[in-house]
Amino acid sequence: MAKKKTKFMCQECGYESAKWMGKCPGCQSWNSMVEEFTEVKAKSSRSYVTSGAGIAKPQPITKVEREQEPRIDTSMKELNRVLGGGIVPGSLVLVGGDPGIGKSTLLLQLSARLADLKQRVLYISGEESVKQTKIRSDRLGVLSDHLYVLAETDMEKIEQAIGEVDPTLVIIDSIQTVYQDEITSAPGSVAQVRECTASFMRIAKTTGVAIFIVGHVTKQGAIAGPKLLEHMVDSVLYFEGERHHTYRILRAVKNRFGSTNEMGIFEMKESGLEEVANPSEIFLEDRSSGVAGSTVVASMEGTRPVLVELQALISPTSFGNPRRMATGVDHNRISLLMAVLEKRVGMLLQNQDAYVNVAGGVRLDEPAIDLGIAVSIASSFRNQHTNPHEVVIGEIGLTGEVRRVSRIDQRVNEAAKLGFKRVIIPDKNLGGWTIPSTIEVIGVSTVQDALEVTLGR
């Protein structure tokens, strides 16, 4: 009879300890140790990632035969963009996001697209019955004989079903519901999630089947389970968006087969998710012209420039400590830029509340939007209207200088394509590229220069 053993494991990094500790020594997180019950058995010689039957031997990398397997085209351009050109056969992809954001809808539509291309897809749900999945598929118009559905949570039965169907793609919804009988802990525990993910990795690498697994997120927005889970998979995709907005953004935070800077944008409708071909037009369609505190910035999301409206509201505070609130941008960046404006431009902002928002529910983390934030703050503080036909681009340093940004030609061309008449850029970006004839480009070297150009003083 196997001997039962108790241990404590960190939910964030997987650190193991014989006793409970308030602070994990591995990742320094507090109150993350949970109790796990395991049975001590003989060690398995099975490897999670194998290259086939027999014993693998070291060989020179120059003698390794490279088999160029074509990627699987999903027929969804936004998803292909995020994945780096399509699904890589034998890859394991983790999809995370808030509850109700549309993860299952996205993957069910992906299954339908591949099934329409005569590719076998196995959709395994541990949260819905087969009839409930059918109801959802009818609403989305997903009907194909090449799409197989299964309601199962037992890892052994799931592996058997994959062998019987022999699909091109497998969807697991979700990894927190799958369990292995050999592990005594409950489904969704650290040990179950780790071992089930390792089993799916082994299946993907040995059979060449692409597997997408859905992962729940914590209150902090991170994928639930040990951080080891994200290290094991090939790609990690986050599906995000505001609950009260119809737009959803798919980002890759890890991708072994492509860039991690790409972004795919979808719009949630009654018939499901629809791709947004030109996100700049969508994010600017509700913009009010001739108002104080509004500025348009050009942010690079991977290889695609996106024009987004930045809004700022500056008002006198009635408390001892002024508030600094930001939605869609880093809160600390706002405090830094306000300090630069106060020190280098002479604005008295220490007794002002500041509220900065990115319209459309988008999150921007690129330094090139610094100048746009500064102009919005100054515009609201002085109550001066900004030019509605103007785009502002530039990074701000602590000394008040406007620093060079990358891919300035793509940003300016996108602004010209959408009908903007003027763009403010760093003066160091003025040479080495062709300026469109339909737009005026003005170079500035400091924040003071930028405010004189945009606000007149």
UniProtKB/Swiss-Prot annotation:
The gene is radA. InterPro entries: AAA+_ATPase, DNA_repair_RadA, P-loop_NTPase, RecA_ATP-bd, Ribosomal_Su5_D2-typ_SF, Ribsml_uS5_D2-typ_fold_subgr, Rubredoxin_2. GO terms for biological process: recombinational repair. The keyword Hydrolase applies. Gene3D superfamilies: 3.30.230.10, P-loop containing nucleotide triphosphate hydrolases. Coiled coil: none annotated. ATP binds at G97, D98, P99, G100, I101, G102, K103, S104. It is an enzyme of class 3 (hydrolase). SUPFAM superfamilies: P-loop containing nucleoside triphosphate hydrolases, Ribosomal protein S5 domain 2-like. It comes from Halalkalibacterium halodurans (strain ATCC BAA-125 / DSM 18197 / FERM 7344 / JCM 9153 / C-125). DNA-dependent ATPase involved in processing of recombination intermediates, plays a role in repairing DNA breaks. Stimulates the branch migration of RecA-mediated strand transfer reactions, allowing the 3' invading strand to extend heteroduplex DNA faster. Binds ssDNA in the presence of ADP but not other nucleotides, has ATPase activity that is stimulated by ssDNA and various branched DNA structures, but inhibited by SSB. Does not have RecA's homology-searching function. Keywords: ATP-binding, DNA damage, DNA repair, DNA-binding, Hydrolase, Metal-binding, Nucleotide-binding, Stress response, Zinc, Zinc-finger. Has a putative N-terminal zinc-finger, a middle region with homology to RecA with ATPase motifs including the RadA KNRFG motif, while the C-terminus is homologous to Lon protease. PROSITE patterns: RECA_2 (PS50162). One of its GO terms (cellular component) is cytosol. Belongs to the RecA family. RadA subfamily. One of its GO terms (molecular function) is ATP hydrolysis activity. Residues 353-457 are annotated as: Lon-protease-like. This is DNA repair protein RadA. A zinc finger (C4-type) spans 10-27. A motif (RadA KNRFG motif) lies at residues 254-258.
